Amino acid sequence: MEEKIIKEAFESKRQFFDSGNTKSYEFRVAQLKTLRKAIEENENEILDALYKDMHKPKFEAFTSEIGIIYDEIDFALKNLKKWMKPKKVSTPLVVHPSTSKIHPEPLGVVLIIGPWNYPFQLLINPLVGAIAAGNCAILKPSDNTRNTAQIIEKIISNIFPQNYVSVAQGPGAMVGPMLIEKYAFNHIFFTGSPNVGKQIMAMASKHLTPVTLELGGKSPAIVHSDANLKVSAQRLIWAKLFNAGQTCVSPDYLLVHESIKDVFIDLMRKTVVQFLGNDPSTSENFT
């Protein structure tokens, strides 16, 4: 994406936010409902894009990428009025007899950077929060899942004006720094690796931009000698194979009691065959 286009996208959103149009309850609700309707209308295209990019089975793709967003939007619509209400807080003695309240206010223009492992859900879910909070947003989808990025841009450009929400496509190593270093976003939401998260935090510090970093890590699992081994094997294999193991909380390694080691390994092998057959790479249920 050209720097001129990025500059225009950021500055137009700053102007639109400063107009105050995004702050009202009615505006936020309307945008959330519009987003939900657009996802529903493009559901099949989204599922097709996820299959082309990652071979995601439709059921797995719906549950992990689309259904979660419906729940998030419904939750926001149900609670938004309560979230926007001023909250009474205690008043310091030195300013008595006054009273004190906290008035929730939108931050401004936010940047949302999504990963490739859940390319739809982990970009749109944070957008739901940004819209509910009354912000404008620029979305940066992963360039590793181009079909999904294209359907996201199609949906967003069809339902939202460019000065409210837009999509910035391109190589992450080029577009990301261009966005973060040159423009003073009011918040950055990033999902990805710790190494890239550190770089984003360092770049954002130039503008004192607060960041939310959802990062990956190691996820050990412990199996005691008195555990139900069959159930444990099924749960662990499901968790490890879901989305081909590309989930931040997917179990990375097991700590098992030595007395059950061989039996448990055999059970896990049998469970893989039960779930995906002798050759998982040919299974339509494997991402």
Where are these regions (language model features)?
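Structural signal for hydrophobic packing residues in well-ordered secondary-structure cores
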Residues: 21, 36-39, 43, 54, ...
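ALDH superfamily catalytic-core signature
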Residues: 195-287
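Rossmann-like NAD(P) dinucleotide-binding subdomain of oxidoreductase/dehydrogenase enzymes
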Residues: 93-231
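N-terminal Rossmann-like NAD(P)+-binding subdomain of aldehyde/semialdehyde dehydrogenases
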Residues: 1-101
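Amphipathic, non-transmembrane alpha-helical secondary structure
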Residues: 7, 33, 74, 124, ...
